Amino acid sequence: MLGEQRITYNSTLENVEVLEAYTLLADGTRVNVEPDKIRTQDDVDADGSNIYSDSKVKLIIFPKVEVGATVYFKSRAQQHTPDFPGHFYTENYFSPHSKYKGVTFNLTHDPAIAIGIDAQGMKGGKVEPLPSDPKGSVRYSFSFEQDTTYPTEDWRLDLVHFAPRFAASSFKTYAEVGRSYQERAYPKTQITPDIQAP
């Protein structure tokens, strides 16, 4: 829906906070989103049924969305627990069905960690660290804007195949991703006394 924005995240691994959200009307009037219109909900799959997982959604319900209005939000996500210990990755894709303005990704990391960056369709790159960054940090800054939109299409490819994106990872190969996944997942496949048949 045009009057809603969803931010999906894993509640076990990260925190998401909406810092600011409003509708800007065609005449320049700003209408703030009320705090009770920013809701945390369980994620649902494509047919609307609940998903048994830690996936949550911050749902922002914008007021007075009408012809000529623009919706804006600013959020902060902080991942406090890695998906794979000893590794980092993040990815964000930009739908061709939405307009984007003023999107910025800043990434700062220790130089001892090798991070690969894929910023297809974005502007930016490596920049000088800020004085507030830890000494010796490596910093990247990328921006993205998209003024045009396209109607949705049935059976279109998934965004990962064509959309502009920002992705960063400490993994060097897909085989390394697979090994890390196996290390985390395999122990959970073992039969425990709690579920073993008598």
Regions found by a protein language model. Give the residues of each.
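Ligand-binding face of N-terminal immunoglobulin V-set domains in extracellular IgSF glycoproteins
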Residues: 1-15, 56-61, 75
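Short, solvent-exposed secondary-structure capping/transition elements
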Residues: 2, 32-33, 80-84
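Solvent-exposed beta-hairpin/edge-strand motifs
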Residues: 7-39, 100-115
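Short solvent-exposed loop/turn micro-motifs enriched in small/polar/acidic residues
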Residues: 14-16, 53-55, 98-100, 135
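Short, acidic/charged, Gly/Pro-enriched secondary-structure junctions
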Residues: 22, 74-76
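Edge strands and adjacent loops of beta-rich recognition modules
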Residues: 41-55, 83-85
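Secretory-pathway-linked proteins and extracytosolic
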Residues: 62, 66, 78-89, 93-198
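Globin-like tetrapyrrole-binding proteins
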Residues: 71
